[in-house]
Structure formats: C-alpha cells, structure tokens
From Swiss-Prot:
One of its GO terms (biological process) is fatty acid biosynthetic process. It comes from Thermodesulfovibrio yellowstonii (strain ATCC 51303 / DSM 11347 / YP87). This is Holo-[acyl-carrier-protein] synthase. It is an enzyme of class 2 (transferase). GO terms for cellular component: cytoplasm.
Amino acid sequence: MIEGVGVDIVAVERIKKIYEKCGEKFLNKVFTEGEISYSFSHANPFPHLAARFAVKEAVIKALKKQKGLTLKNIEVRNNSDGSPEVKIPGFNKKIFISISHEKNYAVAFVVIT
C-alpha cells in the first residue's frame, strides 16, 4: 500500500548560489558527509547536490512533515549497484526514489510503502 508520494524540483543554480554565499555552513546543515563527498567527487558538484536536496524535500512531502525529520537526517546514497537509495535513522518503511538532473534542474520523485 502506498503511504506517501512526494515530488520536488530544484534549480541547480539556486544550490550553487547558496553554497557561494554560505559555504560549508550550508553543506553541513543540509547534507551528510557521504552526500558531500559523493557530490564533490564530480567535476561539477552542484547538479548532484541539487538532486539530493530534491530527494530530501520530496521525502518530507511524502511523509507529511513527520515530527523530528530534518533535511540532514534524510541521507541519499548509492547502493551496491549504483542506484540511489534513501536512509533515515529509525525509519522502517520502504522508500522508492527516482532522481534526474539535466543542465539547470534536478527533480526527484518519492513513493513510500
């Protein structure tokens, strides 16, 4: 049974501008060490940061603003086959995600069962 659905779109340039203004403070407030490391392993980290930000926002929408949920404790990482997955401490439901980024935008779609 589907318990929640969420979608979000993020302008890559928006994430870049926030980073240029706030730097590490922004990164450390929103992203895990793994997400930061993964994103900055690419020549242009901003599409990857934007995609992860979009997933976090879509998860929050799907969970209808569950108490105690923050952007930072929603972690997007790649599993053994390279596909993205979401990990939330203490959360046991299945989270399906789809992420895409192309030039100016990143989008994420989340289904929770």
